[in-house]
Amino acid sequence: VEENMKDFKKKDFIGKEEVVTLTIVLISIILLFINIDSNIINVIMYSLVMIPLAILLGRGTSKISDYIGEKRGGLISATAGNVPELMMGLWSIKYGMISMAKAGLLGAVITNMLLGLGIAVFCGGIKYREQKFNKIIARTNLNMLFLVMFTIIIISALNRYSIVDNGSFQKISLIIGVVLICVYILGLIFSLYTHSNLFILDEKKMLPKNGDKNDTRKVFGLIIIVTILLYFISERLVGGVNAIVEEYKISQEFLGIILIPLLGSFGENASSIVCALENKIDASLETAIGSSIQITMFVIPILVICSSFMGFQVNLLFSTFQIVTMSIAMGMSYFVFQDGKTYWFEGALLIAVYLVVTLSYYYVV
């Protein structure tokens, strides 16, 4: 009888985790219908509500990797985590804040590669002393990022050493954007299908884990609900930021490179940290680096293409300092992850580089 009562309680009553989840979701929905006269309070309010939603997203995607593998789980985590960046980028373009949209996406890459990954490696290293990962995953992902970096450098050189008008630059950016999207799709085919065996650290991870299908559906449902809420909240957030920029004459680029990435990238960074603490270092790397790949090879090209239909011109031309900071982020990540092992000190190095970059950016803009 006691065992039956325990089973009954497990099945019919909501646990503490479900209560917290429902509370966060309900608060988020209520805030969508609240509008305060102060733009600063609105921005703070929507920024704060994005954090618990991002944590929920991170926990959900971490659970998914148990059922579909760390590579696919990391891919889903990165995809879901990049939805806010895409939405905030589109809304920024709609409000005419082109420089903030571009700086926000570049800042998201820097935040993922240095801060998010640094905290994940640091926390994972403190708990497990040493964590091993698949070098092929890291090398392939970083090679794709270097392709984007070379593309941006070539476009910058073209702008510096040739006479090209804005219309031609837009056309060039559109063509290159399509090429990057195609390469990204080919990379997914390579890593998930044709050579998926190369991206598995442990043979046991090839076998699917037994789990309740209802639990899996609940997790997917949670991810969908949280993603939708993040879409609407990001709209309100960008609208508030636009009002603050116009009222206080704050630099769009500074907000884009610092504030927007911290909020938009919170989901994948939280997921990366959770995975590292659970010793799923492959999923952690796939989330952080895979998110940067999606931003540079999918989100940015999509924004370039969409901007043409929105009446704005968004190209792939970045400033010299932006290119330097992005190169430093990729270079540091490459040197840290080339040996197939991570330690807490390497995470501390990545965090230190992020602090140096952000402090430098304060004086540049």
Predicted regions mapped to residue ranges:
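Hydrophobic, membrane-facing alpha-helical anchors
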Residues: V1-K6, P52-D66, G267-L277, I300-S307
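Alpha-helical transmembrane bundles of multi-pass secondary active transporters
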Residues: E2-R59, L114-G239, F318, V324-V365
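Short amphipathic alpha-helical coupling elements at transmembrane boundaries
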Residues: S62-D66, E70, A243-E246
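Residue-level signature of catalytic and energy-coupling elements of molecular machines
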Residues: I64, I110, Y184, V245, ...
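Conserved, well-folded catalytic cores of nucleic-acid-processing
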Residues: Y67, L86, A157-R160, N269
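The feature identifies polytopic integral membrane transport proteins across all domains of life
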Residues: I68-A78, S99-L106, E130-L142, Q170-L174, ...
